[in-house]
């Protein structure tokens, strides 16, 4: 056996015996390092005659290549073994009982729960859920909704505007979920015109909205839900019935008295604010009884300008819409004193006010059972 064959055999045995990456690195340095055994062999090529170099060069370089390949294979094998050992060590037995702790149980956030409750109620009435982008254009957020030029909501101190683009146009974080109404009406109008299929619109729109406001009852990011009905026969009586049914179901009372007060919103005409009967004498508000009134939402008939901007003839179609703050009605229903706590990610708070994951709201089983 030649010296090169003996050296190769020894190095390959050392590689096979290496039990971890530090050991394989030590073998590499001993063989291919600056003073390694293979490196020393390579250095001798410089002192050989051309004939000797031609004979010995391929053998020595072949040795180097085989050692390098063996080192790479062993290193890969060791890494796979390490990963397999770690997976085995950290394996979780999913059949074990869950540890009873706040972190392991988990809770559904009240906002998510209330959104599920609201959508369950309106789904039972035949409404579908619609969504839209949080970043909107001035047109969809204001102009198409009949906000006049110079309206306070268009000012920088009320609305989060982005920097203008190269065309001088500014986008913004939507200040309400109402732009989704326009998007939806445009889509339905396009289907009507293209396919000659005139379907009524019945949608409910939950989502995040943004305004420059922050205190115990206001947040710069908050949640709204609104609804829209557009049909040839939609009227105020329909709207009143829908809202009464919603309030009874949401607050889980057999009956509720509603008071409708004239108001003003740019996108509805007439516009109304709705109060419901309640008792505020105790620590928590009780709905469906008492002598107090509490404002709960705003609503109205869709303004003709909004219908027109969305592709509907106001002489043929009517619509009604309503909207409310999800955070606020969650606070009212479940007795939460400070809106800011909704966004603090405090595990103790969510443990107290949160809901079990299997508390899925249904009208049959009770929304907050």
UniProtKB/Swiss-Prot annotation:
Cofactor note: Binds 2 magnesium ions per tetramer.
Enzyme category, top tier: ligase
Superkingdom of source: Bacteria
UniProt-annotated location(s): Cytoplasm
GO CC terms, sorted: cytoplasm
Catalyzed reaction equations: tRNA(Phe) + L-phenylalanine + ATP = L-phenylalanyl-tRNA(Phe) + AMP + diphosphate + H(+)
Signal peptide: none
InterPro entries (UniProt xref): aa-tRNA-synth_II, aa-tRNA-synth_II/BPL/LPL, Phe-tRNA-synth_IIc_asu, Phe-tRNA_ligase_II_N, Phe_tRNA_ligase_alpha1_bac, Phenylalanyl-tRNA_Synthase, tRNA-bd_arm
Keyword Aminoacyl-tRNA synthetase attributed: yes
Listed GO MF terms: ATP binding; magnesium ion binding; phenylalanine-tRNA ligase activity; tRNA binding
Named cofactor requirement(s): Mg(2+)
Binding residue positions for Mg(2+): 269
Record keywords: Aminoacyl-tRNA synthetase, ATP-binding, Cytoplasm, Ligase, Magnesium, Metal-binding, Nucleotide-binding, Protein biosynthesis
GO biological process terms on file: phenylalanyl-tRNA aminoacylation
Enzyme Commission code: 6.1.1.20
CDD domains tied to this protein: PheRS_alpha_core
Record-linked PANTHER family: PHENYLALANINE--TRNA LIGASE, MITOCHONDRIAL, PHENYLALANYL-TRNA SYNTHETASE
Subunit structure: Tetramer of two alpha and two beta subunits.
Family: Belongs to the class-II aminoacyl-tRNA synthetase family. Phe-tRNA synthetase alpha subunit type 1 subfamily.
Protein name: Phenylalanine--tRNA ligase alpha subunit
Annotated organism of origin: Brucella anthropi (strain ATCC 49188 / DSM 6882 / CCUG 24695 / JCM 21032 / LMG 3331 / NBRC 15819 / NCTC 12168 / Alc 37) (Ochrobactrum anthropi)
């Amino acid at each position: 056996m030649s010296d090169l064959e003996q050296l190769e055999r020894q190095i390959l045995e050392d590689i096979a015996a290496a039990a971890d990456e530090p050991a394989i690195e030590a073998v590499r340095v001993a063989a291919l390092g600056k003073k390694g055994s293979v490196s020393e062999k390579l250095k001798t090529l410089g002192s050989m005659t051309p004939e000797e170099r031609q004979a010995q060069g391929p053998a020595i370089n072949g040795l180097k290549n085989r050692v390098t390949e063996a080192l790479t294979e062993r290193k890969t094998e060791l890494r796979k073994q390490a990963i397999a050992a770690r997976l085995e060590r950290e394996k979780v037995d999913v059949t074990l009982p869950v540890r009873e702790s706040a972190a392991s149980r988990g809770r559904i956030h009240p906002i998510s729960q209330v959104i599920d409750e609201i959508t369950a109620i309106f789904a039972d009435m035949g409404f579908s859920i619609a969504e839209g982008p949080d970043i909107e254009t001035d047109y969809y957020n204001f102009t198409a909704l009949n906000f006049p030029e110079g309206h306070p909501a268009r000012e920088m101190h009320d609305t989060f505007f982005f920097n203008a683009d190269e065309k001088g146009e500014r986008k913004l974080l939507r200040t309400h979920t109402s732009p989704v109404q326009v998007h939806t009406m445009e889509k339905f109008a396009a289907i009507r015109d293209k396919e000659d299929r005139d379907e009524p619109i019945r949608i409910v729109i939950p989502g995040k909205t943004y305004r420059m406001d922050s205190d115990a009852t206001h947040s710069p990011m908050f949640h709204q839900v609104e609804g829209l009905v557009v049909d040839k026969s939609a009227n105020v009586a329909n709207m009143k019935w829908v809202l009464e049914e919603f309030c009874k179901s949401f607050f889980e009372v057999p009956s509720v008295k509603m008071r409708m007060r004239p108001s003003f919103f740019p996108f509805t005409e007439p516009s109304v604010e709705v109060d419901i009967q309640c008792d505020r004498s105790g620590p928590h508000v009780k709905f469906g009884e008492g002598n107090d009134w509490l404002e709960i939402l705003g609503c109205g008939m869709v303004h003709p300008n909004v219908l027109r901007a969305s592709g509907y003839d106001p002489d043929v179609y009517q619509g009604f819409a309503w909207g409310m703050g999800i955070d606020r009605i969650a606070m009212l229903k479940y007795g939460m004193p400070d809106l800011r706590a909704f966004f603090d990610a405090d595990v103790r708070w969510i443990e107290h006010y949160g809901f079990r994951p299997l508390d899925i709201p249904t009208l049959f089983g009770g929304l907050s059972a």
